Each structure stands twice: as structure tokens, then as C-alpha cells.
Amino acid sequence: MNRFAQAATQDTSRINPSNRFGVDYAAEAATFSPLPFPIIDVHSHINGPKAARIYQKAAELYGIGLTYSMTQLEEVQAMREVFGDRIRFIAVPRWSGQDKKHDMGAGFIERIEGYHALGCRITKFWAAPRSVEIAKSIGDPTLMRLDSPVRQQAMQVAHDLGMYFMTHIADPDTWFATKYADASIYGSKSDQYLPLERMLDRFTQPWIAAHMGGWPENLGFLNGLLDRHPNLYLDTSAAKWMIREISQQPRQQLIEFLTRFKGRILYGSDIVTMDEHLAPAENKMEMAAKASDREQAFDLYASRYWALRKLWESDERGESPIADPDLKMVAPDRHSDMDAPMLIGKSLPRDLLGSLYHDAAHTLLEPLHAQSQAGATQRM
């Protein structure tokens, strides 16, 4: 029995999918060694002013000095009031609108320009396999392809504004074994990368491919992708996915990969906040139902930072405190909704940790921010 299982006997009232062992994540933060640099989280979704303040506490406890967030355009100013200069923004479409064709097309271009006017210098192009479902509902199955004409129009606008790109390509191998088993609809996993490679060649500014480029299960593939495209960077966001798959990578092979591409691998969490996390879970959408009060919301946010820091900087070896439903999805006869994989820490050398947590993002993105600030000064 590990120390978390023992802790579960002390406070079972705290047990939830983000806290399988009922631990105090605020107290746990003090057990980490202080870092000589602030962590830069390049991938989050911070919305909701009340939830944002709970996230702010978790971020401060776990050493996050700067957060890049896919905040909805209408909430950018509210988030600035909470975080000041410790948050920067990534342009995204309006996902909640009723006119998807407009929101993914001309409406997205309008929002890119709106974000840019507020100092944002990164645009996110989401192209997960399930985006085909949105495209079909609009009436054009190809609309959400990364290289569709509509997407390229938006990319050209962002490019002309001097913005960098972020993208979501593919999804976990577990999803291709289950949700995406019908390749005639979703394509194979390798199929997802053909549009990306074409766009990397056309738009040569830096790209950040989220979630270890969508294939943390296959470092060999990522080696080739990064070699072919020097403008490509990866972030390490999506805690459950990274815990499950990075834990399985042999430490030496992972270190060799991170060493070879030092400066091109950026830390991210993919934490999602919303004020719905503070209300009882009745008739909520999946993302909103992940928490139903302030304590659960804090656990939801802090657990990701706890787990990711353990993964990268420690020799932790034990079950993850975060439930991973993918286990049950793949093997329902062997797993429950509350089961979790082993978290096997990789104890990265300090130079690689510094690059991952801070230096890579600072070197890549700080010049963009400086340009934004200079432009704002000139307009005054």
C-alpha cells in the first residue's frame, strides 16, 4: 500500500476522480523541492472568474509563474483582472455558438483579429479526429481538416498578423482502439498527420503541437516528425494521457528524446476551469461535471500539477491519484471508472527540467510578447 492509499483512510470525504486517495493537494505542494525558475504552462483553458481564482491558488502553490490560456474572447479582460501579467492568451473559435459554419469560418477570422487586438499572438487550430463529427453536422465533412480551404484562410490571416500556431492532432491510441475504430470515418492515426505536414511546409512560423504532438506513445514517430519540420514544437499537456503513456516510456529513451529536441518540448497541463465546476453536478456536460464544489474544483486543477511534476521531476512509482476512464474504455471487464494507471516518475536531469518547465517556452514565446507590448506602446 503506498502513502496515498494510507491517506485515503484519513479523509475519505475528499475522494473524487481527481483525488482517488483523499489527499490534501495544498499540503502536498510543500513536499516538492523549490525550483530556481517559474514554470511556464503553455496549454490551458482558463475561464470563469470564480474558478480562475481557485486555479490561481493551485498554480501559485505548484510554482506556475505564467499561464497561456485558450480563454474565450469575451472573458479575456476578466482573466487579466484576476492574473495581471501572469496570463497570456491563445485565440480559439467560439465553440458555444449555434451557427457552427460561421463560427468555424468567417467568425473565427473575426475572433483571431479580436484576440490579436488584445495582445494575443498565438492561434489554436483544433483538428482532433472527432472534429469530423462537427464538420458533418455543418454539412461539409472536410471543413475541419487542418488543410481545408476554410482553415487555410484563417491561417493566412493569423500568419499575416505575425501569430504563431498551436494545433491538436490525433488523440490517444486508446481512442483509436475504441471511439475511432471505424477508420472509414476517422482515418487511421497516421492519417491525421498528412494535413499537418502539408501546413507545416506552407506556414513556416513556429507551430506547437499539443499533447506531445498527439502521439506520446510513439517517440520514434515524433523523432521523424520533428526532424522533418524544424518549425515544429511539442507541448506535454493532457495529464491523464501523459501519465499513462510517458510512464511507460523507458527513462533513458525519453531522456535521449528530450535531449535531442531540447528547446522544442514545452510544458503544458491542459487544465480546464469554468464556474460550472463550483455548482452541483446536475444535468451538466461532461467537462462541467468534473467538479461540483470549490474543494473538488481545487482538486481537479491541483491534481494535474501534482501529477505532472511527479512525472517529470521525481522517481515516484505508484498509482496515479487521478482516475483514468480510458482504462475501462479499453478493458471494461478489468477496470472501473475510478481505476488509474501507474505513475512512474522520470526524474529528469536538471538541465532538461529547466528547458521543459521554463527555458524552451521563454525562448520561443517571449519575443512574441515583447513585439505585442511594443505594438501596444506605439498605439498609445
Feature names for model-found ranges:
Residues 1-86, 106, 296:
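An N-terminally biased module of ancient metal coordination in phosphate/nucleic-acid-related enzymes
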Residues 6-8, 76-133, 248-267, 272-275, ...:
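Ligand-binding grooves and catalytic loops that recognize ribose/phosphate and carbohydrate rings
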Residues 31-33, 56-61, 75-88, 110-120, ...:
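Acidic (Asp/Glu)-rich catalytic clusters
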Residues 39-44, 66-69, 87-92, 123-125, ...:
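Hydrophobic faces of well-ordered beta-strands that scaffold small-molecule active sites
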Residues 45-52, 67-76, 96-107, 145, ...:
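Acidic-and-aromatic substrate-binding clefts and catalytic sites of carbohydrate-active enzymes
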Residues 52-54, 80, 101-102, 177-200, ...:
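Distinct, well-ordered alpha-helical segments
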Residues 73-189, 233, 238-240:
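Active-site gating/metal-coordination segments in enzymes
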Residues 206-208, 212-380:
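H/E-rich (His + Asp/Glu) clusters that bind or coordinate divalent metals
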